[in-house]
């Protein structure tokens, strides 16, 4: 499951970035009351949240991948990256649609598609609720990972074999 969760975290992180980029572009072009909507405080807040979520999601999944490349078990870290990034993607997609207003539902802009696509990541490879429980169990000492039945070699070992 770790590999799938890692992939979901990476995809969700990309979705946060796409929502951020589309929202920044729209906020600098769309005008209301004589100013771009990016000048409005709550639009700024939503865009700032997207940036924060993107940076945190990116660091979590990169750390998870780094651990895997070192040959270390990364179930805890991958679960956290998947949980955080998918929740962030759902929030970013909702905010992106909000920033775009009625245009958020239009096929002219990609954010409506982002909003539809984000939900899958929240559900598959373990729902957000399952990942919350897993993280709590790690902290409370109720969960300890067993040795994997089989594992891919560390990436550095793959490079040495070439």
Q: What residue ranges belong to the model's regions?
A:
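Alpha-helical interface subdomain recognition
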Residues: 1-162
């Amino acid at each position: 499951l770790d590999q799938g969760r890692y992939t979901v975290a990476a995809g969700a992180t990309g979705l946060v970035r796409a929502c951020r980029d589309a929202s920044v572009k729209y906020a600098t072009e769309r005008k209301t009351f004589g100013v771009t909507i990016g000048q409005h405080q709550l639009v700024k807040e939503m865009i700032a949240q997207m940036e924060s979520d993107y940076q945190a999601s990116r660091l979590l999944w990169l750390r998870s991948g780094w651990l895997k490349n070192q040959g270390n078990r990364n179930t805890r870290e991958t679960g956290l990256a998947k949980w955080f990034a998918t929740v962030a993607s759902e929030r970013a997609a909702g905010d992106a649609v909000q920033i775009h207003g009625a245009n958020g539902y239009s096929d002219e802009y990609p954010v409506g598609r982002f909003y539809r696509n984000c939900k899958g990541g929240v559900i598959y490879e373990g729902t957000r609720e399952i990942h919350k429980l897993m993280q709590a169990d790690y902290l409370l000492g109720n969960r300890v990972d067993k040795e994997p039945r089989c594992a891919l070699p560390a990436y550095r070992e793959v490079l040495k074999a070439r």
